[in-house]
């Protein structure tokens, strides 16, 4: 019966991750310590799928196990389709240096050069970096007489990070079925058009953040926690916005539009009784 329908679908996703780095550790006389790291990271994602549907099976139970038994495949009327995702690649090289002196003064700096295939060639690469500094006041000589303070540290940090969180297909010139109509001879005709407005000027969303904080531990570790005050600003926000038709084919497009700022404070308090 033509009502006996069998379908089979196969989807395959492949993720490739590769990372490599080396670390240099050195302790110098006088309490100086250096920890340096340099390396790379690579990520790639690919996906593809296949779908098949056949009809007119003689036995209901056989349709999922032997798609050849449906007569529509032999008659050339079975439905088959395949799909392939847009490849997504992310590559970066990075370096980081940490320095400390007698566990009292700390500083660190990092930089990351990162490229994403989601963006056009002119906007693909960007640099992201951060610097931090800290002072463990509790290890100073003038704090030794205050026996109820076990740890008191002040720290400051500033950094720039990037975001490319959108589907890779948004930067591909994809075509899709737009309209279809029947010709006088009874044959269906199809037209194809763009399914999205590619934006060659799209670039990384960037977040700039600075933080001032305090870590503490009092009364032999029975009271501990931290306090942070932060300010954040996000530039070149990635957002899908409405665009006019014409000149655009579709009514929306991903753009870098606007900025967002926030500030606030956070704290944690813990205790052991």
Task: Give the residues covered by each predicted segment.
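Extracellular/periplasmic, surface-exposed regions of secreted and cell-surface proteins
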Residues: 1, 7-8, 12-273
């Amino acid at each position: 019966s033509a009502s006996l329908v069998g379908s089979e679908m196969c989807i395959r996703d492949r993720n490739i991750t590769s990372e490599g780095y080396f670390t240099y550790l050195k302790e110098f006389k006088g309490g100086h310590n250096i920890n340096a790291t340099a390396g790379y990271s690579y990520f790639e994602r690919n996906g593809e799928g296949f779908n098949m549907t056949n009809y007119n099976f003689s036995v209901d139970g056989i349709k999922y196990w032997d798609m050849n038994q449906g007569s529509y495949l032999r008659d050339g009327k079975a439905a088959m389709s395949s799909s392939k995702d847009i490849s997504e690649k992310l590559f970066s090289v990075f370096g980081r240096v940490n320095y400390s002196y007698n566990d009292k003064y700390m500083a660190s700096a990092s930089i990351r050069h990162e490229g994403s295939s989601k963006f056009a060639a002119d906007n693909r690469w960007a640099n992201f970096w951060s610097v931090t500094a800290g002072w463990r006041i509790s290890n100073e000589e003038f704090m030794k007489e205050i026996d109820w303070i076990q740890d008191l540290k002040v720290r400051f940090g500033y950094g720039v990070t990037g975001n490319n969180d959108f589907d890779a297909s948004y930067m591909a010139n994809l075509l899709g079925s737009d309209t279809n109509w029947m010709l006088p001879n009874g044959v269906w005709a199809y037209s194809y058009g763009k399914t999205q407005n590619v934006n060659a000027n799209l670039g990384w969303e960037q977040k700039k953040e600075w933080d001032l904080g305090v870590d503490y531990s009092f009364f032999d570790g029975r009271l501990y926690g931290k306090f942070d005050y932060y300010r954040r600003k996000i530039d070149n926000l990635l957002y899908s916005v409405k665009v006019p038709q014409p000149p655009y084919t579709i009514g929306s497009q991903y753009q870098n539009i606007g900025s967002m700022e926030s500030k606030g404070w956070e704290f944690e308090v813990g205790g052991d009784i």
